[in-house]
Amino acid sequence: GLKDWWNKHKDKIIDVVKEMGKAGLQAA
């Protein structure tokens, strides 16, 4: 289910979100 998918991918997703957040802050 979704929870298994999230647990498998969450570390990568969190890294991507952090990178997008940094890029957004720099662009602002």
Swiss-Prot record:
Report the principal subcellular site.
secreted
Q: Positions modified as Alanine amide?
A: A28
Q: Which Gene Ontology terms of cellular component type are present?
A: extracellular region
Q: What is this protein called?
A: M-poneritoxin-Da4b
Tell me, which GO biological process terms does this entry list? defense response to bacterium; defense response to fungus; killing of cells of another organism
Say what the protein does: The synthetic peptide has antimicrobial activity against the Gram-positive bacteria B.amyloliquefacies S499 (MIC=0.05 mM), L.monocytogenes 2231 and S.aureus ATCC 29213, against the Gram-negative bacteria P.putida BTP1, P.aeruginosa PaO1 and E.coli ATCC 10536, and against the fungi S.cerevisiae, R.mucilaginosa and C.cucumerinum. It is not active against the fungi F.oxysporum and B.cinerea.
Q: Where in the cell is it found?
A: Secreted
Question: Which keywords fit this entry according to its UniProt record?
Answer: Amidation, Antibiotic, Antimicrobial, Fungicide, Secreted
Q: In which tissues is it expressed?
A: Expressed by the venom gland.
**According to the lineage, what is the superkingdom?**
Eukaryota
